[in-house]
Amino acid sequence: MHDKPVALVTGANQGIGLQIAKELAAKNFTVLVGSRDLARGEEAARMVDGGARALQLDVTDQASIAAAAERVRNEFGRLDVLVNNAAITHTRRLPDQTVEEYAKSTRPSVVSLDEIRAVFETNVFGVVAVTQAMLSLLREAPAARIVNVSSGVGSLTRNSDPTCKLAPASRCRLRP
């Protein structure tokens, strides 16, 4: 039996997810660094003190999610904390682009439907799929927790801002 609590952080190979992984490791968790790209996950795991482990996990791929859940079950038998952090945005503002130009380029009326689907697959449906796959493992833990990471762009108030479009619409679905 594994003595330390086990935490899985999706999208932990960079940014906020990586920092969350570091913080959990500092609190004596065994941290699983969830990443679509295993090599990037392994690189990130080396940056986390406390022996974090990379876990290949594409939140938009049911087979990847199932394989990750099976690995957690086989190696640890439970999951104490699930941090749903993985998220994407479809576009970035170019350095020479004005706010007005950027707002026009990100309107749902001009963004391709494939891009919109990709954002929602990761930011909304990926959270649901990973949570569903990990629920039985979370139920094995004495005091399991699920943390859904959102951001200011997920604010319903900000989501009504006409200059703020697609990613906020997907992230506000995670707000309590």
Show which residues each predicted segment covers.
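Hydrophobic positions on the long internal alpha-helix
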Residues: 83, 130-134, 138
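Canonical Rossmann dinucleotide-binding motif of NAD(H)/NADP(H)-dependent dehydrogenases/reductases
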Residues: 1-32
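The beta1-alpha1 cofactor-binding region of Rossmann-like NAD(H)/NADP(H)-dependent oxidoreductases
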Residues: 38, 56-70, 113, 127
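Conserved residues in the N-terminal Rossmann fold of short-chain dehydrogenase/reductase
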Residues: 55-56, 121
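Conserved glycine-rich Rossmann-like NAD(P)H-binding loop of the short-chain dehydrogenase/reductase
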Residues: 27-43
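Catalytic loop of short-chain dehydrogenase/reductase
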Residues: 87-120, 139-176
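N-terminal Rossmann-like NAD(P) cofactor-binding module of classical short-chain dehydrogenase/reductase
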Residues: 8, 80-83, 147
